[in-house]
Every structure is written in structure tokens, then in C-alpha cells.
Amino acid sequence: MNKKNIFYAALLLMAIGAEAKEIKGKVMADGKGLAKVVVTDGTAFALTSEDGSYMIDADEKAHFIYVVTPSGYMAPCNGGTPVFYKTLNENSHDFQLHRWGTVGGKYAMMAAADTQPRGENAFHRLETEAFPDLKQVGFEYMSQNIPAFAIFLGDILWDNLEMFPHIKQEIAKIQIPIYPVIGNHDHDKEVSDDDASAHLYRHFFGPTYYAFNAGKDYYIVLDNILYKGNKKYEVGLNDQQLNWVKSYLQYVPKGAHLFVCMHAPAYFYNCLLYTSPSPRDTR
């Protein structure tokens, strides 16, 4: 084989390796397929058919395949957080959801931010004060047949990421679903690459950006920390997320009530903090 043929063969192998991976599966609840559920890999999107089946060409760099949990449903929880995602390690991934409230019905949403326990005393206060209070409020709503969930808006820990298993155990004791958001202190400070620095967070909590529905409302969770390593970061949204949001908004009705959840403030007084375009400009 001459050098030219070797070169073309190498290009062909590179092209084949860069091809998207076809992923198939079903989204189910109560033994039946759920139609028109949005499925994504963090780049591309698909809608489930009438029998709940989907097919999506997953990006080769995708970490997960996951669903936009529809109104009236909830994914099973592990350590208190909904597992609406599957690690991309097979060609087929099914999802089992369960009923949670009613489609378009009432619900209660609570929010907490910057729990970031640094030492034993901080963990003790979370475990004996803050988390029990959150549980009590959630149970008060549920006693009125109003489903409840909470959103933790980042800095779940304070750089001590070896404590992720412990804090997940404590989150589970709240006994209501907790949707997580990644903060700057939830990144691995030893890693300077933004995507790679979230590896431990993804292991315990799943995607760093995603969406779900509750009642008549639409929620988008974003990672607006551009991590540089060694506790250094900028506030902004990378192009991958902005493109994902732009594509996702085609599934959100115009005029819908939309919540965007992220760790760092989007505005400080009259100053726009983003180093990247505003998500408002994606539609």
C-alpha cells in the first residue's frame, strides 16, 4: 500500500471513529410506554413514539443519555436525587418513571444553595437543622396531597469531594426528590479542564445540565461555572450548553413558565456577569 492509500485509509478510520453512536430504548411508566418524552445526550434530541420507544444518534463525547422528565412523573431516586439518566456504555437504555402528582397539577418547589459543609460542625448543622427543616416542610405539603421537591443550587460541598457519598446519604434522609445543580466548589480543584473537573460530580449526581417539567412549568438546569482548576473559574455558559438550550426550546411552548437554575448569579446589580451570550438570546 502506497503512502497516499495509507493516508486515505487513516482518514476513513478517523471518520468512522467520529461517527455518532445510535442509541435505542424505551421510556416506561406503570408498564406502558410514554409518548412524546424528550430524550437527549446533551447535544441531540429525540421524542419517544406512541409506545415509548426512541432512537438517538449520541455524540461520541456524550457522558449520558437522559430524559426530560415530563409533568406528572418522577424518575427513581438514588441517594435522594432523581436518576433520570443512564451512563452511555451500551447501545440500548430503557427508563422507568413513576407517577408523581398529576400532569399540570399543583406542586411545591423549595430551593437551597451553598450548603457547602467544610467541617464536622457544618455537616452536623445540616444534618440536625437544615435538612430536617426541609423534610418537614416537604412533608407538610405532601400531607395535603401536594407533591414536593427541592433544588440544591450548587456548592453542595466545599472542595472536599470525597464527602459526596456522605452528603448523598444525608440528602436521602430528606425523603423528597432533590434536583442538584453544580457549583464551583463541586469541581475537582486538581483538574484544570472544565469538563473533566466535573467527573466526580457526574459520578454521584449525573449530568451537569438537564431539564425537567413539573406541573405546568418547565425547568432548565445549567452549569455556569467555567472551571480553570485550583479553585479558579469564570462565570458563563459554554457554546455546547447554549446550543443545547436553543435546540431544547423547540419543545417548550411559547409563553410557557420557564425556570432557569444555575449556581452563579446571572446579574449583579446592573452588570451582566456572563462571559458568553445570554441564554435569553437563544430564542
Where are these regions (language model features)?
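Short, ordered, surface-exposed loop/turn motifs in non-cytosolic proteins
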Residues: 21-23, 29-43
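N-terminal active-site segment of His-dependent metallophosphoesterases
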Residues: 22, 71-165
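A short, amphipathic beta-strand motif
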Residues: 23-30, 52, 95, 275
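Short, acidic Ser/Thr/Gly-rich low-complexity loop/linker segments typical of extracellular
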Residues: 40-57
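A short, solvent-exposed beta-strand micro-motif common in secreted/extracellular proteins
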Residues: 61-75
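Extended active-site neighborhood of metal-dependent phosphoesterases/phosphodiesterases
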Residues: 71-76, 162-254
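Short acidic, glycine-rich surface-loop motifs adjacent to enzyme active sites
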Residues: 252-270
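Single conserved hydrophobic/aromatic residue that forms the stacking wall/gate
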Residues: 274-283
